[in-house]
């Protein structure tokens, strides 16, 4: 039996450390240890793994990760009130929990990893979740310093991450996410599982980095997607006019029609337009 069962219930931990959730920090604490264990299992085998966790709060997911054998958990927590609760967990798992009191949006965890590839597993604070994901998907060089991400988002955001062309939620976030990773919504979590209860359903998403995403420059891919989806109701021949290239030339290079709209273009099409944009730029620079 894991020593996690010897630790006090999370509700008692929250009360003892006065951990009332703060809206300004995007906090909603997940107290059901069955659910935290399910999230931890979704990351795959944890034995010998190093895990980055963002916003552990009272430590429910932290406990699950350690109980399932994670060799090391690096918990990045901005709220100093939670540090005492995390130190209690550290005492039960000596040498396996590294606690960092920092803002995850400003902290680079890579120096703590050395040459080890990590897993990122987190119930992300809602107010920084998308920004963190974009940062992780934008790292260079690629493949990245992590091999799996299992993350919780608002259901609406999760749908935007995994969407494919011709789906309502398909947009810039889906293009970047699915260009660089295989994405899947694993399961939903009811608002009733959290304290305090949010007004929306949450979803756990797994992202596995692709070793070789379709060849193109990330910044140009994002530039093309931003132009196309910035006027998503318009045809590409109109929405792509903000780019330094003839829209017809870009769509021809991708084998798509200039009368199509952004939501109908697969990621391969966006990558092809990004490559053509790079070729045009390079030829212009040589001229």
UniProtKB/Swiss-Prot annotation:
Q: Does the keyword Acyltransferase apply?
A: no
Cross-referenced SMART domains, in alphabetical order?
A: rADc
Q: Which reaction does it catalyse?
A: adenosine(1518)/adenosine(1519) in 16S rRNA + 4 S-adenosyl-L-methionine = N(6)-dimethyladenosine(1518)/N(6)-dimethyladenosine(1519) in 16S rRNA + 4 S-adenosyl-L-homocysteine + 4 H(+)
Q: Which domain of life is it from?
A: Bacteria
User: Per UniProt, which keywords does this protein have?
Assistant: Cytoplasm, Methyltransferase, RNA-binding, rRNA processing, S-adenosyl-L-methionine, Transferase
Coiled-coil positions are none
Q: Which CDD domains match?
A: AdoMet_MTases
User: Gene Ontology cellular component?
Assistant: cytosol
InterPro entries per the UniProt record, alphabetical: KsgA/Erm (IPR001737), rRNA_Ade_diMease-like_C (IPR023165), rRNA_Ade_Mease_Trfase_CS (IPR020596), rRNA_Ade_methylase_Trfase_N (IPR020598), rRNA_adenine_dimethylase (IPR011530), SAM-dependent_MTases_sf (IPR029063)
**Residues binding S-adenosyl-L-methionine:** 28, 30, 55, 77, 103, 123
Q: Where in the cell is it found?
A: Cytoplasm
Cross-referenced PROSITE patterns: RRNA_A_DIMETH (PS01131), SAM_RNA_A_N6_MT (PS51689)
GO MF terms here are: 16S rRNA (adenine(1518)-N(6)/adenine(1519)-N(6))-dimethyltransferase activity; RNA binding
EC assignment: the record states: 2.1.1.182
Q: Does the keyword Transferase apply?
A: yes
The family annotation for this protein states: Belongs to the class I-like SAM-binding methyltransferase superfamily. rRNA adenine N(6)-methyltransferase family. RsmA subfamily.
What this protein is reported to do is described as: Specifically dimethylates two adjacent adenosines (A1518 and A1519) in the loop of a conserved hairpin near the 3'-end of 16S rRNA in the 30S particle. May play a critical role in biogenesis of 30S subunits.
Give the NCBIfam families listed for this entry: ksgA
Q: What is this protein called?
A: Ribosomal RNA small subunit methyltransferase A
- Native organism is Nitrobacter hamburgensis (strain DSM 10229 / NCIMB 13809 / X14)
